[in-house]
């Protein structure tokens, strides 16, 4: 094993990986001493235009030594997720490949494709066509392994993980994956170009905790939590027009930029709202797509049994919010990946009512609402009937004084409101 790793080190130290605009792909391949080596860089599919050819900070770590070994995709994905959160690169041995080797069969088009410049150089140096095709098969397998098996699991949505799921999925610019295979050992490295460093994420962790304490989030209802977080974003984070068109300034896309630097573009606003809301116990997703025809990010948030849209970056500086807890957003077009998520989230068909106490759908606070709340307090069960809000929405609206508890004080307040005494 030590002998193999020394050969891996020699190979990978010699491989230079550059970036290229999608769909162009970067190949750094060599065939020496019986080793097959491939690598490729792909931009984050959310914003491929940000991938450039001359500013990658990623290099393969296959030469690092001391790598872990995994025999299932789930184990490898868990390792990648932990390394991602630490803003580290990663390399590992993988034994979960098919019995006949880490290769995928080529289509006729892939097999007959013209040689790339790098392949032609290898052919000119004496590399056989069979070896070139084997490289293509290995590259196809590692591409499939990383992008279709590992990363979807790495970015899987977990409601109680504020810095996982959608947060990680939107916080890197590109990924380079490389593989080495000698007929016995299959090594993989995955290198992300992150928007932030580990130190910046640690600073954001501390700042997020301090902000939530300042907002007294723990004492609020879910609606009041979102209202406080959204209000802080709209009032304290400036839209980063200075770097809006600068694709090399990655901080603008991050929660760190919004929280610590107090400046971000839409992606940074959405990432921070996601992070703060999940840390507060409110389910949230990040929606990706276009806003007025340009790449944009916004949020879905869950209140009661329904989901609502929110876009803090479009409400910055407004006295009244037009993009908070809406059933739809004008000029916002989700991409296919987000549409798949949205289909699993039952959307509200109306703007969230910011007037607690409306326990049915008649848009007024009257004696019927008082009767519904009295029944709920007496029986402990949400009343059933035409027009009565679903259970989750009912409990939210029933907390009339927004103290986090539904009790006789809410009933008294609701009665006085219905009678015109408030």
Where in the sequence are the language-model features?
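Secondary-structure boundary elements
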Residues: 196-258
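Extracytoplasmic/secreted proteins, especially bacterial periplasmic and envelope-associated proteins
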Residues: 75, 79, 137, 203-210, ...
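Intrinsically disordered, low-complexity N-terminal segments that are enriched in acidic
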Residues: 28-187
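Sec-dependent N-terminal signal peptides of Gram-positive bacterial secreted proteins and lipoproteins
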Residues: 3-27
């Amino acid at each position: 094993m030590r002998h193999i790793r020394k050969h891996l080190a020699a190979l990978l130290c010699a491989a230079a990986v550059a970036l290229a605009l999608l769909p162009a792909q970067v190949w750094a391949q060599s065939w020496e001493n019986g080793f097959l080596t491939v690598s490729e860089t792909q931009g984050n599919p959310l914003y491929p235009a940000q991938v450039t050819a001359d500013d990658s900070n990623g290099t393969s770590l296959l030469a690092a030594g001391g790598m872990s070994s995994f025999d299932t995709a789930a184990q490898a994905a868990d390792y990648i997720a932990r390394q991602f959160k630490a803003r580290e690169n990663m390399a590992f041995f993988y034994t979960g490949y098919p019995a006949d080797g880490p290769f995928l069969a080529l289509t006729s088009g892939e097999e007959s494709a013209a040689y790339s410049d790098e392949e032609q150089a290898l052919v000119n140096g004496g590399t056989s066509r069979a070896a070139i095709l084997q490289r293509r098969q290995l590259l196809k397998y590692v591409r499939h392994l990383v992008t279709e098996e590992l990363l979807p699991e790495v970015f899987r949505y977990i409601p109680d993980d504020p810095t996982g799921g959608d947060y990680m999925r939107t916080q890197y610019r590109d990924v380079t994956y490389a593989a080495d295979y000698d007929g016995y050992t299959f090594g993989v490295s995955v290198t992300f170009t992150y928007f932030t460093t580990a130190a910046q994420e640690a600073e954001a962790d501390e700042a997020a905790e301090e902000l939530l304490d300042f907002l007294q989030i723990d004492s609020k209802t879910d609606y009041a939590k979102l209202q406080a977080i959204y209000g802080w974003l709209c009032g304290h984070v400036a839209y980063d027009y200075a770097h809006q068109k600068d694709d090399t300034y990655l901080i603008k896309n991050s929660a760190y930029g919004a929280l610590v630097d107090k400046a971000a573009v839409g992606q940074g606003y959405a990432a921070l709202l996601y992070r703060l809301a999940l840390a507060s116990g409110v389910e949230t997703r990040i929606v990706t797509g276009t806003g007025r025809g340009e790449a944009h990010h916004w949020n879905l948030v869950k209140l009661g049994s329904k989901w609502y849209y929110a876009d803090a970056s479009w409400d910055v500086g407004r006295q009244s919010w037009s993009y908070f807890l809406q059933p739809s957003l004008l000029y916002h077009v989700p991409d296919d990946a987000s549409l798949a998520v949205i289909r699993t989230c039952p959307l509200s068909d109306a703007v969230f009512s910011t007037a607690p106490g409306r326990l049915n759908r008649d848009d007024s606070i009257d004696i019927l609402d008082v009767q519904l709340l009295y029944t709920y307090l007496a029986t402990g069960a949400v009343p059933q009937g035409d027009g009565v809000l679903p259970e989750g929405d009912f409990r939210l609206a029933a907390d009339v004084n927004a103290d986090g508890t539904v009790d006789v004080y809410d009933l008294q307040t609701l009665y006085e409101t219905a009678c015109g005494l408030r």
